[in-house]
């Protein structure tokens, strides 16, 4: 899809206050590392991730998303009455229903005429939300829209650490699917898009494309399994190498399609 009337007017983010290093995580996993003969520094060496950030315990995604949405609206200088859509585009949410976007919409004070919904699609939620809003602007249905999301990785990492520490059957092979979970951090971002005629910046969104390889859908799967893990924290299992190869191959095909 090519756009003629869509601009990326502003981008904003909220950075979590708690810094957690890869060394700290490995120190907590010292009994596992010692039993399996894993060298310290492995986590940073294999991923390049020195540290990640988390929000304070108990922080709801919608609370942070409200702050970020307010920030992007203020940064744009756009009258909030022009915002015709608010999409919450992260994996993390305040509850199953209503949509987390509803609380953000109320917190920011956007018009009742705005479309309000969640779009949750793994790491792609914000990009998917951008295209939904861009399509609406291009069609003339709205003049502006905000897509915002907040991911909170604390519970996933903490839960993974506890599971690894209490798994007496763990081997160097069986720990691999949990490895990617130890890299997860937190953060929040928002993008405001608007009609070209409304834009002060003229920064156009030229287009977007999508392509799916659903055969790879089992390479990274996460969620809450209370019966299996004994608590309500999420866990995730990832075939990191397989996912990388599948993702790069798909990205190449999508890029070639987008250029046509």
Label each PLM-derived region with a short phrase.
Residues 85-91, 118:
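Short glycine-rich or small-residue beta-strand-to-loop segments that form or flank ligand, phosphate
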Residues 1-57, 170-245, 253-256:
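Condensing-enzyme catalytic core mediating Claisen C-C bond formation in acyl metabolism
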Residues 34, 70, 74-80, 94-98, ...:
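Acyl-thioester C-C bond-transforming condensing/cleaving domain
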Residues 65-69, 126-130, 248-255:
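Short, hydrophobic/amphipathic alpha-helical packing segments
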Residues 68-84, 253-260:
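Phosphate/pyrophosphate-binding loops at sites that engage ATP/ADP/AMP, CoA/4′-phosphopantetheine
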Residues 60-61:
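ATP/NTP phosphate-donor binding region
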Residues 37-40, 66, 98-102, 248, ...:
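Short, surface-exposed alpha-helical segments at coil->helix boundaries
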Residues 5-7, 85, 143-147:
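Short glycine-aspartate micro-motif
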């Amino acid at each position: 899809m090519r756009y003629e009337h869509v601009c990326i007017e502003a981008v904003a983010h909220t950075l979590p206050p708690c810094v957690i290093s890869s060394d700290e995580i490995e120190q907590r996993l010292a009994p596992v590392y010692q039993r399996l003969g894993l060298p310290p520094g492995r986590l940073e060496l294999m991923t390049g991730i020195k540290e990640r950030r988390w929000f304070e315990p108990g922080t709801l995604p919608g609370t942070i998303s409200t702050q970020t949405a307010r920030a992007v609206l203020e940064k744009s200088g756009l009258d909030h009455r022009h915002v015709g859509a608010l999409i919450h585009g992260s994996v993390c949410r305040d509850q199953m229903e209503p949509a987390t976007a509803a609380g953000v919409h109320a917190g920011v004070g956007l018009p009742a005429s705005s479309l309000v919904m969640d779009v949750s699609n793994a790491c792609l939620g914000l990009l998917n939300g951008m295209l939904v809003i861009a399509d609406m602007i291009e069609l003339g249905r709205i003049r502006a829209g905000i897509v915002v999301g907040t991911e909170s990785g604390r519970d996933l990492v903490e839960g993974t650490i506890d599971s690894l520490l209490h798994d007496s059957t763990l081997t160097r092979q069986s720990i691999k699917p949990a490895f990617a979970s130890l890299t997860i951090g937190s953060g929040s971002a928002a993008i405001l898009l608007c009609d070209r005629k409304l834009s002060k910046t003229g920064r156009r969104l030229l287009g977007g494309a999508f392509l799916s390889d659903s055969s790879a859908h089992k390479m990274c799967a996460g969620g809450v399994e209370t019966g299996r893990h004994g608590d309500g924290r999420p866990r995730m299992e990832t075939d990191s190498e397989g996912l990388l190869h599948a993702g790069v191959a798909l990205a190449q095909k999508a890029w070639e399609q987008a250029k046509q």
